């Protein structure tokens, strides 16, 4: 149970952090406080100061220190990346892609666009006995 909670918290913090700071393959933006996603390896790079500022604004109750956050989020440090020194990185979790979720519609399934769907809500028409002229 504890492991699940830790993983959920890790996922949540990383998702919020990446969504608010991410740039793709623009490593010159590291110094400007962005998280840079290497699209080939699905690894995100960032400066410790960027994470520190994010934690102070959004996740101060979750982690006591930035070092604790780096450890729990399973971040690693590299001395040098694309011209920047002391860069941290973490593999980006698979986030839900909102565009890829589409409900497949069965051709035989009725929808609100079909007349037959609305027929069930309409009062039934009773046939009145026809009067014949004699």
Predicted regions and their residues:
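DNA transaction DNA-binding modules
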Residues: 1-134
């Amino acid at each position: 149970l504890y492991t699940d909670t830790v993983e959920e918290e890790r996922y949540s913090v990383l998702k919020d952090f990446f969504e608010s700071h991410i740039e793709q393959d623009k490593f010159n933006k590291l110094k400007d406080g962005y998280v840079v996603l290497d699209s080939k390896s699905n690894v995100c790079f960032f400066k410790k100061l960027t994470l520190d500022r994010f934690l102070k604004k959004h996740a101060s109750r979750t982690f006591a220190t930035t070092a604790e956050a780096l450890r729990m989020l399973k971040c690693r440090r590299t001395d040098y990346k694309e011209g920047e020194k002391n860069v941290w990185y973490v593999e980006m979790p698979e986030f839900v892609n909102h565009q890829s979720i589409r409900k497949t519609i069965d051709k035989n399934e009725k929808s609100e666009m079909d007349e037959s769907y609305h027929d069930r809500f309409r009062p039934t028409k009773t046939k009145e006995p026809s009067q014949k002229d004699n």
